[in-house]
Amino acid sequence: MFVHLTRKPNQLKILIAVLLIAASASAETRGNLDFSKIRIKNFGQTSEAYYRGAQPESRDYPALAGIGVKTVIDLTRDGRADEQGLVEHAGMRFYRIPLTTSERPSEAAIAQFLSLVNNPANQPVFVHCQGGRHRTGVMTALYRMTNDGWDANHAYEEMRQYHFEGFPAHPVLKQFVFDYYTKLDQTRQANNRQDEKAVGASK
């Protein structure tokens, strides 16, 4: 809608009021989502754009769509054969990134995962594996360290809150999280040094 700014100030005031009310209603809706129909084990909300949990049952997909989820990402290697159909029938997108609980995620898997979860068209996403603990815990830790600036200790603490078992059960995955953060931190520091040099050279 076009509003002439100089000749119709009353319309402008009305438009601003409508926009403010709409923004307030949207924020209130996001803050008061109804999770009562979610029965997924180990379910949690990492951010407004990211949910996590265990393998959903058939009844859970409409419930996920009901809280606004647009994309389901399955991290299991041999997930349920009918999951894609159930997800798409509920109006959501489906992706599978096959991971194991005994091997580090590949660079290709990490790149695909971060691309999917950071694409606004896919958000909010729901990320799951079988129990929502190990593969989901690791990939959510990468999300936290990459997007939220968390260090490895902070990310691992959250993994434990969702029942991740590091030693002796899954030492490879735990070590991977700490190694990933070390590499990420080194890259950030190198980029900061390059930025500082560029600023100094421009003066």
Q: What do the PLM-derived regions correspond to, one by one?
A:
Residues 2, 23-126, 138-203:
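Cys-dependent protein tyrosine phosphatase-like superfamily
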Residues 13-23:
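Bacterial N-terminal signal peptides
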Residues 129:
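Short cysteine clusters
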Residues 2-15:
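Bacterial N-terminal signal peptides that target proteins for export
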Residues 132:
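Substrate/cofactor-recognition hotspot
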Residues 135:
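Glycine/aspartate-rich loop-and-adjacent alpha/beta segment that forms the canonical ThDP
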